[in-house]
Amino acid sequence: MKSQLLAATAVALLAFAPAAAQGAKPTPAEAKAFVDKAEADLAAFNQYVAKSSWVRATYITEDTQWLEAKATGEQNELVTRYAMEAAKYDGVAVDPVTARKLKLLKLYLVSPAPNRPGAAAELATLTTRMDSTYSSGKFQYKGKTLTLNDAEDILAESRDPAELKAVWEGWHSIAKPIKPDYVKFAALSNEGARGLGFKDTGALWRSNYDMDADAFAAETDRLWKQVEPFYRNLHCYVRGQLNDKYGDAVQKRTGPIRADLLGNMWAQQWGNVYDVVQPKGTTSSYSLDKLLTAKGYDPLKMVKTGENFYSSIGMTPLPETFWKRSMITRPQDREVVCHASAWDLDDRDDIRIKMCTKVNGEDFYTVHHELGHNYYQRAYKDQPFLFKNGANDGFHEAIGDFVGLSALTPTYLQQIGLLDKAPGADEDIPFLMKMALDKIAFLPFGLMVDRWRWEVFSGEVNPEHYNEAWWKLRLKYQGLVPPGDRPADAFDPGAKYHVPGNTPYTRYFLAHIYQFQFHRAACRQIGWKGPLHRCSVYGEKEMGKKFNAMLEMGASKPWPEEMAVFTGEKTTDASAVADYFQPLNAWLTVQNKGENCGW
């Protein structure tokens, strides 16, 4: 199989549509023939790349890194040449389907390689090495060697500011060796993007949303302005509670928050410090962590429970191969990429997840989220190859998050027997606080990661100022500062997986808006009359049919058309976030009276 795929690649690199060689204006028929050939060749090659990547992610060695780099390098070269050829059909009066495929072909690669010998292989080597350096990162603390998982546990559980600072700095130190590779990667990726007609890689990324690149940047600004006041309200309250806990010497009552005090390595979700910021005079009658343990859940049962949710809304159970081939727990005998992800290895039925699952509420949610990717992948499996994707990358993230909103409700926990009785309305504020500490706290981080990369790719920020620019944006959007002065050669962006892993991040910001819009629409469809945060769509098969109809469209239509199939709306509307959290935002406004909010 491998030799056949490589042979097909060699043919593909030499055999483009004849119109290009003739120099005459291509015809619509030639454009369609070109697209058909490109799809066939890319589909044939995709399985080889996917399986090489899976092996490397689940068994990190020099050999598997070499294999993945070779496969992705060959794919990058193939796609880059096809993408450049696609540009030659600009202006040809093709049918709408062919036109969309030509556009998607030019946008296929996250980071296209320059069209010159050796460039694709070099880019693939850099991206594989950065990912592996991050994934195998370790540091010393109190005579012990700590992994990211170890460090995350300490940040979640410790309330010793000195320990938090030391562990935070320890993990961030692993990113320093990544910087030289990132500098080279950014330059190569930009060269490739410019070869396809984009100003830089950032402009290429922003062109993936069925609108002009600059219009998309403005759209994310619009959405951020809709939710920013709520974030600032939450920030103000949390900062006050941290000040009560630690005092002025650690966390002042005004200004930004120290990033290591929020229970998460990147301060992107703050739910782990709920014990510090819990609304006074309120109680939570249950802990999802404790419920899972008490009911005898293990990682496999958690995934089975996630599957059951999707089955309850009418989706076909996962294939047997999913259970045989997925990595559900962390192996003890080798290095793996623990970052949770969902995989489609053959564009048909070989779907899998890769997780180092722990029995806790966070991973209970993550399971429902990752399975959302798998069910989306399977829903669009009958689409042509270039349409086998989400309506946009934010949709792909939002599908599982939408299900996750139901999965965390006491309504659902009672439906599946984890909770004997749903709590009363007096527990709504603590429930919404827990949700906001994860969902609302995330929003500015979801925005700023790519804001930083856009500045890097555009040349606005040069390598000497990478770290300074990173913290300038973290202060601007999140109101956060590091726990101490950062070394001049630090590369703190590299301590977040998606930077060395080369995964665009604005998708997560969008997903955190879309999921509430989907949730509100679904709850209206099922006739839910209560507060949005109590609504569960578990068991709602009619709603599931409408939902799956959107998923089956893949990337075949612009995302507004696909969104309308399920929600009836063609624009992104963050008012659903406000609707969901309205009781908490009103409560926070009262609590913050007299505080000097902002930073």
Indicate residue ranges for each PLM-predicted region.
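Positively charged n-region of N-terminal signal peptides that target proteins for export
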Residues: 1-4
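Bacterial N-terminal signal peptides
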Residues: 7-17
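N-terminal helix-rich structural modules
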Residues: 22-184, 202, 496, 503-506, ...
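C-terminal, non-catalytic "cap/extension" segments appended to globular domains
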Residues: 23-30, 64, 200-203, 269-284, ...
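Active-site-proximal, well-structured secondary-structure segments within enzyme catalytic domains
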Residues: 145-148, 157, 184-354, 424-432, ...
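Active-site scaffold of zinc-dependent metalloenzymes
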Residues: 162-169, 333-360, 367, 371-378
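Post-HEXXH active-site segment of zinc metalloproteases
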Residues: 202-203, 207, 377-403
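Post-HExxH zinc-binding segment in Zn-dependent metallohydrolases
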Residues: 216, 220-230, 390-427
